[in-house]
């Protein structure tokens, strides 16, 4: 039997066989890559015969991923953009909403890294930037489906998640889908992370990323990327600005516009209408429209998040008969993702949203897109209505316009080849909800607060719009709009000059105050510090509700003096907060005021608690101020520890060189005097040490045992003491322990016939025979008297 059969091991030639198999597999992979590259090089860009993904020169993992995700037929933008991207060209892609732009850049990303044999050790190879978190999450999900057969590592980097967890995994990622702000934060803060090996950069919704709102973040982001890279830019409204292209370092980009020659810039199967409704009737029209379409899937776009919150809360109380959702940028990321998934899965629901979901988000089967607020430009309109009629499906869109906005907006839409028709609202469909909103605002202060916030945000958004041909702030009925929201009065809105709406819209959330909405021109004047008694505090006391200060800022009551006729009960005087302060200040306080404690404010004794505090040093410390350290000169004058003199006083004492010489002489003499004392002290210590050593040696010769620490020391005869007095006082024993160290004798045990009284009698008898030991023989009369006194006692 051969030896390898006993041990169970195979022959060595099998190991060589496995090595040969690996080499052959590596060789086949190299040949497949060469063939794939050859097919890409031979690809004819002018041919329009490519209709399916199987006809493109794609790798096996990509083809299998497309088949698993059920992608078979190419859209127009994919048929034109993918071949150019496979050849390494920079692309500017423009196509209608819902035309498949996401897949048009994901396939080139996977193929670029696959042909380069990219691994996790090569670092970041592809970067995909999206303007919103929801769109980035959607792109990442499509990437997971299409790239399921690839071995690349991909990550989603958006705000609202743990920065530390992202940083730990970032250096192992090959493909990143991100938002600009979060990615820039990682480039600036994450140690060891760079993009020096980046192969391809993708900008989805590029016109939104390149506008003024993201300009600073994108410019800083581009500085971290290498210049030698492939760049792909896609959007439904593409930018051709030379400055934008130069910022991204594009090299001879190919402009792909599939629907440039189309009759309309929006999908052909999209029905577009607009309704002219005054601002005061906007909510009534919106509520009636929702009530008439309860079996539909609806998206309602509003201009601000505060409007979204107010409309959602008020309609939720009205219960129109359809599930309601709301989505805006102020929500936490988890809530935003949950609402997005719920709306995607629902068949009959209404979503109130801002422009957070206006771009790129693919909501299936949306029936209606309602723009309750006029969009800021035509591009925003195109992206909003693009949430319906996705890829050859039908959809309908409605735009609400104020009579002042109608002429300018229609002219803008006509220039962009957008067909839109006017429709009128049926009278029987109209239903006023003004009284219901007013009742709800009266009963619910929080809803009233949201209404005031919504009014302010809408007024600011209209005032800050650049296109004054469409948005005419002075022609809006703001008083009627406030009444239609259910508010008792028109909130006061103040504006600042030179504001940029896009910069404000895209500003970091940390820079915005969530608790205050005031934009006052100047800071409030600080009142002069005065002595405030408990009566002053009583006059200044106001409502402690959380919204009370907000109401005082917004609502002005009593300013309207238009009515000349007096009512039966007329207001003769309106007390303001300032008037209350004056009344409180005019009150003559009888409180006792104590000055001179050292603090900045005097101490006011206006209660028994204050009088009691006078007796406590701890409580009075805060009224005494901070202590100061003073130094007294030879004349007894107090000076601070560190004093600064001006130049005139310094020069009055003589030239600087003479003062320096005098200072050196004084310090030298002071040091010499101190040196004499130091030498004498050192000499005395040496003498004491020497005498201590001699005394220890002498005691050792005499047989005295010492611990070494308290050795006897012989003093000088000059001290007036007997040098041998210390030696006489020492115990002269036989080397045993001293009496103090001996244990006291044990007490004798009691006999059976003894008790405590016997012990007391015995102690009394002992005390009668007291013996007084005399240390020395009395020599003087005083010694004899002291001895006699002791015997008498």
Curated annotation (Swiss-Prot):
Motif Q motif: chain residues: 51-79
Record has Amino-acid biosynthesis as a keyword: no
Any GO MF annotation of the entry: RNA helicase activity
Residue span(s) of domain Helicase C-terminal: 282-431
Major place of residence: nucleus
Catalytic activity: ATP + H2O = ADP + phosphate + H(+)
PROSITE patterns in UniProt: DEAD_ATP_HELICASE (PS00039), HELICASE_ATP_BIND_1 (PS51192), HELICASE_CTER (PS51194), Q_MOTIF (PS51195)
Enzyme Commission identifier(s): 3.6.4.13
Domain Helicase ATP-binding: 82-256
PANTHER family for the chain: RNA HELICASE (PTHR24031)
Complexes and interactors: Interacts with the U3 and U14 snoRNAs. Associates with pre-ribosomal complexes.
Protein's recorded name: ATP-dependent RNA helicase DBP4
Native organism: Gibberella zeae (strain ATCC MYA-4620 / CBS 123657 / FGSC 9075 / NRRL 31084 / PH-1) (Wheat head blight fungus)
């Amino acid at each position: 039997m051969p030896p390898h059969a006993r041990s169970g091991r195979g022959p060595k030639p099998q190991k060589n066989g496995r090595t040969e198999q690996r080499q052959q597999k590596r060789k086949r992979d190299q040949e497949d890559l060469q063939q794939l590259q050859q097919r890409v090089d031979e690809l004819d860009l002018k041919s329009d015969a490519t209709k399916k993904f199987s006809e493109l020169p794609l790798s096996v993992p990509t083809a299998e991923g497309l088949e698993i995700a059920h992608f078979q037929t190419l859209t127009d933008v994919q048929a034109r953009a993918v071949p150019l991207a496979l050849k390494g060209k920079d692309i500017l892609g423009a196509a209608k909403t819902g035309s498949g732009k996401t897949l048009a850049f994901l396939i080139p990303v996977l193929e670029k890294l696959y042909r380069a044999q990219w691994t996790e050790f090569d670092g970041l190879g592809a970067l995909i930037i999206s303007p919103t978190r929801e769109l980035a999450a959607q792109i990442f999900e499509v990437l997971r489906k299409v790239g399921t057969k690839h071995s690349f590592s991909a990550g989603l980097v958006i705000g609202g998640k743990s920065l530390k967890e992202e940083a730990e995994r970032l250096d192992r990622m090959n493909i990143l889908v991100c938002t600009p702000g979060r990615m820039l934060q990682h480039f600036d803060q994450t140690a060891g992370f760079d993009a020096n090996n980046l192969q391809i950069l993708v900008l989805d919704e590029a016109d939104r990323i390149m506008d003024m709102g993201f300009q600073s973040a994108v410019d800083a982001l581009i500085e971290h990327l290498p210049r030698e890279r492939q760049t792909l830019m896609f959007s439904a409204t593409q930018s051709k600005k030379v400055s934008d292209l130069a910022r991204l370092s594009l090299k001879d980009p190919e402009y792909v516009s599939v629907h440039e020659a189309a009759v309309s810039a929006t999908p052909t199967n999209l029905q577009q209408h607009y309704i002219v409704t005054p601002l005061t009737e906007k909510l009534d029209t919106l509520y009636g429209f929702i009530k008439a379409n309860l079996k539909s899937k609806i998206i309602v776009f509003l201009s601000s998040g505060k409007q979204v919150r107010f409309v959602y809360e008020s309609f939720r109380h009205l219960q129109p008969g359809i599930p309601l959702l709301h989505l805006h940028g102020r929500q936490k990321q988890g809530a935003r993702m949950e609402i997005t998934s719920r709306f995607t899965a629902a068949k009959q629901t209404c979503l109130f949203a801002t422009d957070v979901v206006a771009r790129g988000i693919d909501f299936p089967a949306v029936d209606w897109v309602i723009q309750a607020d006029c969009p800021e430009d035509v591009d925003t309109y195109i992206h909003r209505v693009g949430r319906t009629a996705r890829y050859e499906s039908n959809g309908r869109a409605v735009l609400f316009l104020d009579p002042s906005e109608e002429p300018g907006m229609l002219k803008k839409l006509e220039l962009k080849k957008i067909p839109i028709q006017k429709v009128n609202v049926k009278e029987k469909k109209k239903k006023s909800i003004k009284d219901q909103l007013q009742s709800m605002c009266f009963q619910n202060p929080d809803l009233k607060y949201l209404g005031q916030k919504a009014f302010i945000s809408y007024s600011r958004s209209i005032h800050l719009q650049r296109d004054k041909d469409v948005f005419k702030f002075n022609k809006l009925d703001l008083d009627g709009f406030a009444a239609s929201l259910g508010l008792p009065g028109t909130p006061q809105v103040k504006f600042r000059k030179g504001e940029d709406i896009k910069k404000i819209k895209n500003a970091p959330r940390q820079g915005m105050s969530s608790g205050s909405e005031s934009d006052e021109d100047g800071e409030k004047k600080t009142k002069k510090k005065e002595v405030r008694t408990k009566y002053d505090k009583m006059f200044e006391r106001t409502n402690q509700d959380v919204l009370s200060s907000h109401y005082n800022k917004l609502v002005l009551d009593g300013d309207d003096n238009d009515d000349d006729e007096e009512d039966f009960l007329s207001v003769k005087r309106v007390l303001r907060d300032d008037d209350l302060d004056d009344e409180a200040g005019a009150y003559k306080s009888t409180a006792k005021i104590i000055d001179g404690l050292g603090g900045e404010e005097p101490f006011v004794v206006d209660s028994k608690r204050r009088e009691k505090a006078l007796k406590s040093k701890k409580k009075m410390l805060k009224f005494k101020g901070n202590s100061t350290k003073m130094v007294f000169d030879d004349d007894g004058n107090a000076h601070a520890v560190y004093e600064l003199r001006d130049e005139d006083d310094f020069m009055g004492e003589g030239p600087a060189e003479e003062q320096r010489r005098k200072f050196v002489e004084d310090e030298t003499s002071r040091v010499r005097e101190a040196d004499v004392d130091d030498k004498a002290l050192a000499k005395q210590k040496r003498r004491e040490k020497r005498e201590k050593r001699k005394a220890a040696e002498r005691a050792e010769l005499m047989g005295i045992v010492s611990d070494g620490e308290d050795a006897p020391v012989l003093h000088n005869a000059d001290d007036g003491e007997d040098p041998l007095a210390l030696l006489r006082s020492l115990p002269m024993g036989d080397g045993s322990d001293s009496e103090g160290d001996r244990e006291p004798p044990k007490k004798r045990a009691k006999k059976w016939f003894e008790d405590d009284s016997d012990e007391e009698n015995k102690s009394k008898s002992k005390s009668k025979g007291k013996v007084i030991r005399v240390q020395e023989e009395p020599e003087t009369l005083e010694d004899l008297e002291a001895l006699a006194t002791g015997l008498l006692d």
